[in-house]
C-alpha cells in the first residue's frame, strides 16, 4: 500500500525512476494515477505537491531518462576515434539499453510516441524533437570527420544521419517486440558499412 504522506526520506531521483518505469511500460495515457502511486510508493497528493501534475511529472521523467539512461549513447558516439566506430558504439550502447533486463524494453521516447503518447501539443513536440535529436548528433559527428579529412567532402551527412536515426528507432521497436539481443547486435555490425563509400583512404 502506498504511504499516505510524502515520506521524510522522499528521494526525488528514486521517485522519478519509478515513474519513468511506469510510463515506459504503459505509455502516458495508459499510466493512471493509481499506477504511479503504486510505482512511486507515495500518494497522489504528494505526487501533485512534488511534481505539479501528471504532465509535469512525465516531462521531468523525459529529462531524467536523457541524463540517467540515454546519455551513454551520445558519449559512445563522440568518444570513438572516428564516426564509423562511434556510430557502431552508439548502436551497441542503444541495444544494451533497449534490451536491459531492468527496463521495460525498447526506448522510452520511441515507446511514448508509438503508444499512448501525451495529447498536449507541447509534450508531443518535445518527444518528436528528442527522437530526431539523434540525427543532429550523428550529423555533427560526421561533419567532424569531414573537417578532419576522415570522410570525403561530398559525404551525404544529412541523409546518413537521418538514416541512422531511423534505424535506431527501428531497433528500439524491434527490442520492444522481443527481438533478441544477439539478432539486434548482428544488425548493429552492419551499421558502420553505410559510411565506407565516403571514407578517405
Language-model-detected regions and their locations in the chain:
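N-terminal intrinsically disordered/low-complexity leader segments
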Residues: 1-10, 155, 199-201
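Helix-turn-helix
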Residues: 2-3, 14, 22-56, 60
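Short hydrophobic clusters on alpha-helical segments that form packing/core surfaces
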Residues: 15, 19-23, 94, 168, ...
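Hydrophobic alpha-helical connector segments
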Residues: 60, 74-105, 157-164
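Amphipathic alpha-helical packing segments from all-alpha helical-bundle domains
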Residues: 70, 85-88, 121-147, 159-162, ...
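Amphipathic alpha-helical segments used for helix-helix packing
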Residues: 86-87, 100-125
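Amphipathic C-terminal alpha-helical segment
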Residues: 97-100, 144, 164-182, 194-201
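Hydrophobic alpha-helical segments that form the core
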Residues: 105, 110, 114, 155-174, ...
